[in-house]
Amino acid sequence: GGTLFGIGMTIAGGCANKNLIRLGAGSLRSLVVLVFLGISAYMTLKGLFGQWRAGFLDPIAVDLSRWNLPNQGLPGLLSRATGLSEKTALLGTSLALGLGLMAFVFKDGRFRRNVQQVLGGVALGLLVVAAWYLTGHIGHGENPDTLETVYFATSSRTLESLSFVAPTAYSLELMMLWTDQTLRVTFGIATAAGVALGSLVYALATQKFRWEGFASVEDLRTQLFGAVLMGFGGVTSIGCTIGQGMSGVSTLGIGSFLALAGIVAGAVGTMKWQQR
């Protein structure tokens, strides 16, 4: 899933989040990409692609209990391998990855000197944490109708953070079935709409709003193919560059690192092929 998403976002000119930003800035091309991405994602969640996904892909899984691992977190794996306590393993893993990533990004002098990018990265990280807190703490409570403990306003019925593939699909569903009283504006839908709206406000404030379309029929064909790959791959990998690359990795889950590796491999491989 990650590999297909990486291929798709490269040939479509950007991931779901980037296309939402471009949509707010006036890109009709991104509007078409998002519509096809949403349709593909919805087909993978509940439609034609979903039947194949549920029948052939979902049953394939690694049974972590065979190694007495309680979950797929890296700290648990480190604790099991070294005998360290879970708290020590969590602290060590967090420090190693955090410091390693900081060393990697700050070795680039251009990035260090770009205060706007540094502050933007910090803000994105804080938003991921805030989203976990919002959906997992504030949005978690007792349903007054059933008296069961539930997560409110999330499509997955569990806590969520920033992600944009499935929310794009659910946004299309909500707009098409607006009168269905069982549907509601979830955290993911609100986040996707907020990104596009924020981009629109920024583009208008800085006078960068420009209408943009497709350059040619070939450009249209390529973008649509990439959008379909992103929709299928994003659902299959349970996240996109933001959903797995930031939100997922913040949980230190092995699956998120695998998905991120697939996204990077797919993107790099596609760019190499384009530049051949």
Residue ranges, per PLM feature:
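Membrane-interfacial helix-loop segments of redox and metal-homeostasis proteins
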Residues: 1-276
